[in-house]
Every structure is written in structure tokens, then in C-alpha cells.
From Swiss-Prot:
Alphabetical UniProt keywords: Ribonucleoprotein, Ribosomal protein
Domain of life: Bacteria
Family from the record: Belongs to the bacterial ribosomal protein bS16 family.
Name of this protein: Small ribosomal subunit protein bS16
Signal sequence bounds: none
GO molecular function, one term: structural constituent of ribosome
Organism encoding this protein: Campylobacter fetus subsp. fetus (strain 82-40)
GO BP annotations listed: translation
Membrane-crossing residue ranges in chain numbering: none
NCBIfam families on file: S16
Pfam name, any one: Ribosomal_S16
One GO cellular component term noted in the UniProt record for this chain: small ribosomal subunit
Length: 75
């Protein structure tokens, strides 16, 4: 199974926030995920990013790839 760390959209119309989740790369954006490791809220100033660094490091160590957006916001 190819795993990827990516964002899944939550919230309501025109007020999105995102969960940072680990999922199978073949699944759709908002379908089931393996584990939720944080969240990202771009609608507040400043943007809020909270990530469980230990779990992110674990998933990277077992071969999970980061999506472009997750790689950018977790720097």
C-alpha cells in the first residue's frame, strides 16, 4: 500500500479548514484515512498549523510521501 500524508477538507461552504491525514494514495481526497496527525486552518490570521511531529516522523520513516501542500506548510 502506497501511503501519502495529505490534506482532507472539512468545514462549511467558503470556510474551509483541513485535517492532515495519512491515507492510501489511491483513495479520493475525502474518503477514509488511516490516521489524522494534525490540522491546518488558513482562514484565521495568522494561519494555524498543528502537527503531531512524532507521528509525522514515523510515517515518513516507513515510506509515506508528503503531498506538495503538506510539505510546504510543515516546514
Amino acid at each position: 500500500m502506497a501511503t501519502v500524508v495529505r490534506l482532507t477538507r472539512m468545514g462549511r461552504n467558503k470556510r474551509p479548514f483541513y485535517r492532515i491525514v495519512v491515507t492510501d494514495s489511491r483513495k479520493r481526497r475525502d474518503s477514509g484515512w488511516i490516521e489524522s496527525i494534525g490540522y491546518y486552518n488558513p482562514m484565521v490570521e495568522p494561519e494555524v498549523v498543528k502537527v503531531d511531529a512524532d507521528r509525522l516522523a514515523y510515517w515518513k520513516s516507513v515510506g509515506a510521501k508528503l503531498s506538495d501542500r503538506v510539505a510546504r506548510i510543515t516546514k
